[in-house]
Design a protein with these regions (language model features):
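A short acidic, Gly/Pro-enriched loop at the edge of an enzyme's catalytic core
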Residues: 111-123
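Conserved beta-strand signature within the Rossmann-like core of class I S-adenosyl-L-methionine
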Residues: 149-156
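C-terminal alpha-helical "lid/dimerization" subdomain adjacent to the S-adenosyl-L-methionine
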Residues: 156-211, 216-224
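A short glycine-rich, Lys/Arg-flanked "PGG" loop and its adjoining helix->strand segment in the class I
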Residues: 136-147
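Conserved class I S-adenosyl-L-methionine
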Residues: 1-47, 66
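Core SAM-dependent methyltransferase catalytic element
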Residues: 211-214, 220-245
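Class I SAM-dependent methyltransferase SAM/SAH-binding core
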Residues: 54-56, 60-112
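A short SAM/SAH-binding and catalytic strip from SAM-dependent methyltransferases
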Residues: 122-135
Length: 245
């Protein structure tokens, strides 16, 4: 099974209990609730009035639903996810919240975003970049953003020690064993494979600059334990000149 197929299978199985599981994991390692973490990202993000927003790896639609139902005045919110069952959960939540008209959902990969160049004023992504090829994610985000548009990300951040092959190997083993015992074999493979995609604050800054983003701001949030990698909130603006490398 390739990585993409395993991710889809993993989150298909996880979809009915996704928010409960992620809430428990964030609380266990970072001391955050899932709702609190997402709300922090939204509050830290300049939401463009009458703008178009794209939420990558939208999952059960928490970000689009929160933005659409809290009077931010955006024109449209789009949620993209690679897993149909996650989007099905999002649609059910949209119906119960009576906000179906404000949100569009699409099943697709953030590695190949099915929108034209310069479509959105804001692109968001929470707790998912570690399952993606980061350079491709940034390039695609740049492509679909309007000039002056904002990219806003929240996810786990690594340290420079993670670059060392032996450290990376040990982290993969630790992730595999932990999720094998707490979840299942597919989740174990997915999270072990994600270790290579975790970037440090410095690496994020370099990659954003290489892609052509400006006004880069990366904030480390507090973690429950010192030995646990800290979460990062990452924001950057698409410059009015230049282009994705």
């Amino acid at each position: 099974m390739d990585d993409k197929a395993n991710i889809i299978e993993t989150f298909t199985e996880l979809a009915p209990r996704y928010e409960e599981v992620v809430n428990a994991e964030l609380n266990r390692f970072w001391g955050w609730s899932y709702t609190g973490f997402v709300n922090h990202l939204i509050q830290a993000t300049p939401i463009p009035e009458k703008g178009k927003i794209l939420d990558l790896a939208t999952g059960t639609g928490v970000i689009p639903i929160t933005v659409a139902s809290n009077g931010f005045g955006v024109s449209r919110v789009h949620g993209l996810d690679i897993t149909m069952s996650m989007l099905a959960r999002a649609r059910k939540k949209m119906i119960s919240s009576n906000i179906r008209k404000e949100i569009d959902l699409v099943c697709a990969s953030a590695m190949d975003i099915p929108y034209e160049n310069k479509t959105f004023d804001l692109v968001t992504c929470a707790l998912a970049t570690h399952h993606m090829e980061v350079k491709t994610l940034l390039s695609e985000s740049w492509r679909v953003l309007n000039e002056g548009g904002i990219l806003s990300i929240a996810d786990v951040g690594g340290s420079n020690l993670w670059k060392l092959p032996v450290v990376k190997f040990l982290l993969r083993i630790a992730a595999f064993v932990y999720f094998l015992f707490t979840e299942n074999i597919n989740r174990a493979w997915a999270e072990a494979g994600a270790v290579s995609n975790v970037r440090s604050k410095e690496e994020w800054s370099d990659l954003l600059t290489e892609t052509g983003f400006q006004n880069i701001k990366i904030t480390k949030l507090k973690s429950k334990y010192r030995w646990v990698p800290e979460p990062l909130v990452i924001q950057a603006t698409k410059s009015n000149s230049g282009g994705s490398k």
